Curated annotation (Swiss-Prot):
Keyword tags: Hydrolase, Serine esterase
Gene Ontology terms, MF aspect: carboxylic ester hydrolase activity; hydrolase activity
Family: Belongs to the AB hydrolase 3 family.
Superkingdom of origin: Eukaryota
Protein name stated in the entry: Family of serine hydrolases 3
Length: 266
């Protein structure tokens, strides 16, 4: 029996490993058929949801709906916190990198990285030079085969910019929702444009800030992974095509899941 392939799954802000696992059920089931096991680490920073929106201008905002998280669970986490006085100013605590290093050593090595929102932003940064940033050897973690970003963005703080100047070798799929009001299109495209032309693919779905679970969409993602990891794809160093036409209209399954997500019913 061939060894199981593994994917590192990085959840979004105000989520957790369990919440992200529940919200990627369709993707997980289909990737399992392709021989992949998905691993969900949980960010080390606990978040008080009640303290998120305290100012007068923020009152009435719904954390569960805005961050595509659970309305019932108070056990939610984040990978880093922004400076309240400057959106583009933040530092990722070294314990985050230490935690992920140990997680890779204990559960890896991994074939790919998939992230959502803040987790995709962190994942995109890590993938610029995964082993150097996490202090891993090539024996501990061989070269990653792919990276998928759902609503991910380029880290804005100046201290992280030099990493994006590298020629990133990991093939990437960048997914954004046309109705996403949490992460602006310009921020998603900034991460996308950090990759060389022959190492990046853009996929747009008609939904908002969530990971779609419709069968046509999941099939496209799985087909992309199969194409990028196939012997032919690796030899020709080319990105497989994705069919945008399948997503011109919202899928009923996605709409229902999004409504359920807003109710916090995982």
């Amino acid at each position: 029996m061939s060894e199981k392939k593994k994917v590192l799954m990085l959840h979004g802000f105000v989520q957790s490993d369990k919440i992200f696992s529940a919200k990627t059920g369709g993707l997980r089931k289909n990737l399992k058929k392709l021989g992949y096991d998905l691993y969900y680490p949980c960010a080390p920073h606990s978040i008080d949801k009640k303290a998120l929106f305290q100012s007068e201008s923020e009152k009435g905002r719904d954390a569960a709906k805005e961050f595509n998280t659970s309305a019932t669970s108070d056990e939610v986490y984040g990978w880093f916190f922004r400076n309240p006085e400057s959106f583009n100013s933040f530092q990722i605590d070294q314990k985050v990198f230490n935690y992920l290093r140990n997680y890779v050593l204990e559960n890896g090595p991994f074939d790919g990285v998939i992230g959502f929102s803040q987790g995709a932003g962190l994942g995109g940064y890590l993938v610029t030079d995964f082993n150097r940033i996490l202090n891993l050897t090539d024996e501990q973690q061989p070269a990653l085969k792919f990276f998928i970003s759902f609503s991910g963005f380029k880290l804005e703080d100046q201290s992280y910019q030099k990493e994006y100047h590298r020629i990133i070798q990991v093939p990437s799929l960048h997914v954004r929702g046309e109705l996403d009001e949490v992460v602006a299109e310009s921020r998603i495209m900034a991460l996308y444009e950090s990759w060389p032309d022959n190492k990046r693919t853009l996929l747009v779905h008609p939904g908002a800030h969530f990971v779609p679970n419709s069968k046509p969409f999941v099939s496209q993602v799985c087909n992309w992974i199969q194409g990028i990891t196939s012997k032919e794809g690796q030899e020709h160093n080319a990105q497989p095509e994705v069919d945008r036409k399948q997503f011109d209209k919202p899928q009923l399954e996605d709409d229902l899941l999004d409504m359920i997500d807003s109710l916090g019913k995982l």
